[in-house]
Amino acid sequence: MFLIVGLGNPGNEYENTRHNIGFKVIDNIAKEYNIEINRQKFKGMYGEGFINGKKVMLLKPTTYMNLSGESVREVVDFYNLNNDEILVIYDDISLEVGKLRIREKGSAGGHNGIKSIIAHLNSEIFSRIKVGVGQPNGDLVKHVLGKFTKEETAILSESIEASTKAAAEIIKNDVKTAMNQFNGFKASTTV
């Protein structure tokens, strides 16, 4: 089984914030592959289904961002998963809105959700799709917990769709293939 985790914060007040783009991508994957995210366990909401004939679990941790690793660890332990069966999708402030970056491993880069996952897995080796949410002009917390502008929202729909395709490519083939295909991605709509 392959675990696909989208990072975000639970609660309506965070629903359309930059920090919750991982949840948005998971919702899009669920819609695309008819997977219902309607079960609660592992400190998260999840659903199981198939992508390209391979069994997957879509997980949205409900622990708040900084504790996401607790949820991921519970799934990994329960299903005895290896790190190469984990894909994490999350926001990246170092990328402009409309860009993606796929990686096989790496540091947290200041992202507290990834920091938590690395700590709970005791490893930086797991694949990830980073979705650009733009650089903050001032306060970082206000930026990541802020909502997207109308223009950015139009661009984001392309990023979400590309992230969905990239996740499917990782499941079907591998991370390197997805990197070659999507690391140069830039939404055609611009701000």
From Swiss-Prot:
InterPro entries xrefs: Pept_tRNA_hydro, Pept_tRNA_hydro_CS, Pept_tRNA_hydro_sf
Localization of this protein: Cytoplasm
Site for Discriminates between blocked and unblocked aminoacyl-tRNA, residues: N9
SUPFAM superfamilies from the UniProt entry: Peptidyl-tRNA hydrolase-like (SSF53178)
Ranges annotated as spanning the membrane: none
UniProt catalytic activity: an N-acyl-L-alpha-aminoacyl-tRNA + H2O = an N-acyl-L-amino acid + a tRNA + H(+)
A single MF term (Gene Ontology): peptidyl-tRNA hydrolase activity
Binding site for tRNA: Y14, Y64, N66, N112
Record-given protein name: Peptidyl-tRNA hydrolase
